[in-house]
UniProtKB/Swiss-Prot annotation:
Record membrane topology: Single-pass type II membrane protein
A GO MF term: glucuronosyl-N-acetylglucosaminyl-proteoglycan 4-alpha-N-acetylglucosaminyltransferase activity
Location(s), subcellular: Endoplasmic reticulum membrane; Golgi apparatus membrane
Enzyme category, top tier: transferase
Keyword Disulfide bond attributed: yes
Main subcellular location: endoplasmic reticulum
Entry protein name: Exostosin-1
Effect of G447D: In ttv205; induces defects in wing patterning due to impaired movement of morphogens
Annotated pathway: Protein modification; protein glycosylation; Glycan metabolism; heparan sulfate biosynthesis; Glycan metabolism; heparin biosynthesis
Organism (species): Drosophila melanogaster (Fruit fly)
Amino acid sequence: MQAKKRYILVFVSCAFLAYAYFGGYRLKVSPLRPRRAQHESAKDGGVQPHEQLPSFLGAHDMQELQLLQSNQSKSLDSSKHLVTRKPDCRMETCFDFTRCYDRFLVYIYPPEPLNSLGAAPPTSANYQKILTAIQESRYYTSDPTAACLFVLGIDTLDRDSLSEDYVRNVPSRLARLPYWNNGRNHIIFNLYSGTWPDYAENSLGFDAGEAILAKASMGVLQLRHGFDVSIPLFHKQFPLRAGATGTVQSNNFPANKKYLLAFKGKRYVHGIGSETRNSLFHLHNGRDMVLVTTCRHGKSWRELQDNRCDEDNREYDRYDYETLLQNSTFCLVPRGRRLGSFRFLEALQAGCIPVLLSNAWVLPFESKIDWKQAAIWADERLLLQVPDIVRSIPAERIFALRQQTQVLWERYFGSIEKIVFTTFEIIRERLPDYPVRSSLVWNSSPGALLTLPTFADSSRYMPFLLNSMGAEPRHNYTAVIYVQIGAALGPNAALYKLVRTITKSQFVERILVLWAADRPLPLKKRWPPTSHIPLHVISLGGSTRSQGAGPTSQTTEGRPSISQRFLPYDEIQTDAVLSLDEDAILNTDELDFAYTVWRDFPERIVGYPARAHFWDDSKNAWGYTSKWTNYYSIVLTGAAFYHRYYNYLYTNWLSLLLLKTVQQSSNCEDILMNLLVSHVTRKPPIKVTQRKGYKDRETGRSPWNDPDHFIQRQSCLNTFAAVFGYMPLIRSNLRMDPMLYRDPVSNLRKKYRQIELVGS
């Protein structure tokens, strides 16, 4: 009995000590914790709530988070009565992928009918440019059942209720749209949201629901990552297409220009956005740092001006804005009333490296573009550190940053069309079955818009990425002969001689003959023997066939078009394509030499017949000439090498208006191919040797003998330039010849001896 009491006493004592230790410790670490919270924690296994867990954020990160949360709470308080979108949208929850399985097409709602007063809802110039860019592109469809994306016919760019472009009654207009479905698969473009005095970022004045927002001045707490798209802010005069190219003409040493850092703009003596700009005078020294502001804007600036306004205005008038842009190494891009600024795009175009002073701003297309390669970040709260930041950047990085500003401007930001198409491609890459381009493709020239991932599984097959990836084009070439006249095939015929010459080349892999002539295909026995070289003959739609025609022949359907010579035929398996007219008179050495030159420049057109373009002041139009001058900008594809990717791009990327122009004229396809390649590479073609003529004059009738043929080509050139929005062709005076070409040495020392026998 005594032993039993002792055991009970020991057990009770241990239980009391355990309760005193563990219970007292929990009361000590959370003395103010509510009983209900303690009970819930006990049910969860004693896990502490996240508010009481230790933070691993640094002091700087904690300050940044507090600043963002305070700004967000102010914005929400100012517009808490507005529900502008579904906040938790993702592509998986707010987007119908089944609409996009076949093709990525965009439908635009038709304009609203006139109201009782005979007036239509207003549409701003910029929104009309967006609609025009889509309607004239390959994305557009007039069939809503085939569309993947829907674009509103209602102008939503400016949602500032004080603006003249503000469209009223948007909620009721959205309710009348037949395919609205709470915004699913819709995209809404917006540049300005909110109004004076708080300019709330999420104040659109309507519920966007599940629609994707393509919006300027987006903050990190407002952006639905992986769903919305941040776009740049652009002004009312921004061009629809192409527009001005980057203004950096050279990237020479020294890297620093006259001014190290510059800014010229207005400051706000009251209201949001005034804190940073009102302090910029501390950085201005008038020597290498020029940061000037003015108070002269708005209706009540005189009543609200502060003591510095007069001095700031005098200093402001001393400097020209364009001069500062062109002569500054860095350009400050502070936030204004909203996070974004026009100066961002202006600095990119001028090659003035942007120094961003806008905390929490999500940069345009940030999910794809690596902005560390083109911009510098600064902190609004650490304004006085900006001079030290820009002075610490080495010259080699300044070179790289400046170069990247030009790449991004020309490929993504130079026009409204490029901004809209980039937005579409970002959304397109979110689709489950569409291949995703690498960061290298997005952040190097020519950019993602001109790199179609459906062409090949790997980027190494793109001609302009071979050097950066340390790769070489695949060996050998495919000769493609376009037959338009179809003269009788015999040993003395130009086509017969051409096929025989090609078979002697050491680099040819296959010969493809495109028969577009009205005459029937020659019999198989009339073609020259090609030994081990496969010969394929394709009869283009509309031409006739004879029994047993062609060595390996097939027929396409429909009316033949001259653009069919640039179709991506399955028979073309090599990277190099040798494009030839049926009456070309080149020898084997000329073919081999041109191919070896092309292997060093696989992104360009390399060939023999050269032409030039020029600006005709008397006609205020572009001119085209075949005269022998000291420069050229076109190498005709009647005797030239190029990469097969350009066939794919020509067929699947070019505007349908351009292809229609070629088809209607049955001419100019070679000029269009030159414009395309120059647009992609921003480089001229390459002419080899001094050969001028390349056609057999005994062939007979030829479209080149038609006097209207030349006039037609000038008209085509101007049409192409108008559709591109600028003139892509680039002049060159470079010509490549073989080693010892025309030198007074023995012919036995020369590799390409037949070239020596060719006259001019």
